[in-house]
Curated annotation (Swiss-Prot):
PANTHER family: LARGE RIBOSOMAL SUBUNIT PROTEIN BL34M (PTHR14503:SF4), MITOCHONDRIAL RIBOSOMAL PROTEIN 34 FAMILY MEMBER (PTHR14503). Belongs to the bacterial ribosomal protein bL34 family. This is Large ribosomal subunit protein bL34. One of its GO terms (biological process) is translation. GO terms for molecular function: structural constituent of ribosome. InterPro entries: Ribosomal_bL34, Ribosomal_bL34_CS. It comes from the Bacteria. It holds the Pfam family Ribosomal_L34. HAMAP family: Ribosomal_bL34. The keyword Ribosomal protein applies.
Amino acid sequence: MKRTFQPKNLIRKRRHGFRSRMATRAGRKILNRRRSLGCKKLCA
């Protein structure tokens, strides 16, 4: 059985990147929460 995590940078950016977060209302909520927490890195 192969492992579940097969790292690929493009897929990582597309799923968890800044633009995909900005695209939905829920994603913007995530960004705002991470800003309020003071995270240096907001997303992938």
